[in-house]
Amino acid sequence: MKSKLIILLTLVPFSSFSTGNNFEINKTRVIYSDSTPSVQISNNKAYPLIIQSNVWDESNNKNHDFIATPPIFKMESESRNIIKIIKTTINLPDSQESMRWLCIESMPPIEKSTKINRKEGRTDSINISIRGCIKLIYRPASVPSPVFNNIVEKLKWHKNGKYLVLKNNTPYYISFSEVFFDSDKVNNAKDILYVKPYSEKKIDISNRIIKKIKWAMIDDAGAKTKLYESIL
């Protein structure tokens, strides 16, 4: 019998999410500050799932500055489990945030897929592995919790030729919930999903005349802030 594996990757900016009603993570970001953080996983299926968790960097490479434990385990149906995040290095910046991705992957046990295929008369076994990834943000002790009314004063938007430039003068990773150019919502905003600390992003606005920017950010709990405005 042939076996195929399909992996679906999900990155979502909500307060919690369900990956195709397969498993649910109770948050969309982990803030690592002075205590060991954790996430709760719920198996919503009527059969067990194999759960594997890893930490990746922003370049989609496995990262060893943090580990997720347990790294792999079996979840019974209609059950919950906790994954803890442990920092394994002291070589992270102490004056600004660092970000990784916590990725959690689920797959039905092989025997479950085999029974389904036999029942349906198929000779191939297809296991669908679903991976959900959430932001893992390390916030050193010297960096206080963000106050967004203060942060907004240090986010600078300006035009430079065909580019709209966003400069982040804060020690925080700033994630955006929504962005408006004048009154038009930016639906394909992959270039401005988030901006790193003390960095800038350029957004190509060729053939557009923009006079005003409105935006909402995402707070530590995954909720949307109020809309802020900047005149260009």
UniProtKB/Swiss-Prot annotation:
BP GO annotations: cell wall organization; chaperone-mediated protein folding
Keywords, alphabetical: Chaperone, Fimbrium biogenesis, Immunoglobulin domain, Periplasm, Signal
Pfam family, one: PapD_N
Superkingdom to which the source organism belongs: Bacteria
Segment forming the signal sequence: 1-20
Compartments (UniProt record): Periplasm
Gene3D superfamilies xrefs: Immunoglobulins (2.60.40.10)
Functional description taken from the UniProt entry: Involved in the biogenesis of the CS6 fimbria.
Protein name: Chaperone protein CssC
Annotated source species: Escherichia coli
